[in-house]
């Protein structure tokens, strides 16, 4: 009788352990969201953007001859933007993405140290010039995607861009000391992103480097703080939160 009760108790324990193991296994399994998304050939998205930008500066030979401008330093400045995403699937690993329209509000600062500031032109020994840009852009990227792991995936991308600055001449009439920027810029971009799958959308935080290849300095010998600069190239780090479906 004792052995029979012992066997029944052991059987109950085995059943309870099996049920607990099955429950834990079922709880541990994640639901796969948007399982058919990889079958889409084309899908849309929208991106919310924060950017930090600066100018890569190359001095004009006149800078060495200047006795008034001692130092010109480019500085970082932040901005925001919105973008539409159009993605076409080429293969399980590769996609091509066009970002249009992309609207960026960007700022670039130059700090001047002057030896002989002109009070008549409201100049100071140290003065900063904020250059505002409103950029309409068209970046095109090739994306390389990893395998999907549950509701997560990593991707890398690279490509080119063209940008048109709506504010390049917005303040050209105000002061002699302005630095003018050209309207059109071309550049290259590269970055990395992460797909997080949710029941009705994909959230993709992304970071990219965006470097302009064009000299965007619109040289004007009449501008006091411009003629010591030869070339200006745009440099930007872009953080995006992308919502896709």
Where on the chain are the PLM-derived regions?
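Repeated loop/turn-to-beta-strand initiation elements of outer-membrane beta-barrel proteins
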Residues: 54, 93-96, 150, 200-203
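Outer-membrane beta-barrel channels and translocator barrels
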Residues: 39, 91, 147-151, 197-199, ...
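Short glycine/proline- and aromatic-enriched beta-strand/turn motifs that initiate or cap beta-hairpins
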Residues: 27-79, 244
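Residues that define the transmembrane beta-barrel architecture of outer-membrane proteins
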Residues: 40-42, 76-80, 132-136, 152, ...
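Flexible, solvent-exposed loop segments that connect beta-strands
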Residues: 58-73, 105-133, 167-181, 216-230
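Structural signature of outer-membrane beta-barrel domains
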Residues: 51-55, 103-108, 161-167, 210-214
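Predominantly the C-terminal beta-signal and adjacent terminal strand-loop region
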Residues: 183-185, 193-245
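Residues on the lipid-exposed face of transmembrane beta-strands in outer-membrane beta-barrel proteins
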Residues: 46-50, 82-88, 100-102, 138-144, ...
């Amino acid at each position: 009788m004792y052995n029979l009760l012992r066997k029944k108790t052991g059987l109950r324990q085995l059943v309870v352990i099996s049920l607990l193991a099955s429950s834990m296994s079922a709880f541990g399994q994640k639901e796969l969201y948007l399982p058919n998304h990889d079958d889409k050939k084309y899908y849309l998205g929208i991106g919310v953007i924060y950017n930090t930008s600066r100018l890569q500066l190359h001095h004009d030979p006149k800078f060495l001859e200047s006795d008034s401008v001692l130092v010109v330093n480019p500085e970082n400045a932040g901005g925001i933007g919105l973008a539409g995403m159009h993605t076409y699937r080429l293969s399980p690993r590769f996609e091509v993405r066009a970002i249009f329209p992309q609207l960026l509000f960007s700022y670039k600062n130059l700090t001047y140290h002057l030896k002989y500031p002109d009070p008549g032109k409201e100049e100071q020994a140290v003065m900063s010039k904020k250059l505002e840009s409103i950029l309409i852009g068209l970046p095109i990227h090739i994306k390389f995607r990893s395998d999907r792991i549950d509701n997560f995936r990593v991707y890398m991308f690279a490509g080119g861009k063209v940008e048109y600055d709506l504010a390049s001449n917005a303040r050209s009439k105000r002061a002699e000391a302005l630095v003018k920027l050209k309207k059109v810029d071309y550049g290259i971009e590269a970055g990395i992103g992460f797909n997080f799958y949710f029941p009705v959308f994909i959230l993709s935080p992304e970071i990219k480097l965006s470097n302009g290849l064009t000299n965007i300095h619109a040289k004007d010998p009449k501008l006091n703080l411009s003629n010591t600069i030869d070339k200006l190239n745009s440099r930007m780090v872009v953080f995006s939160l992308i919502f896709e479906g």
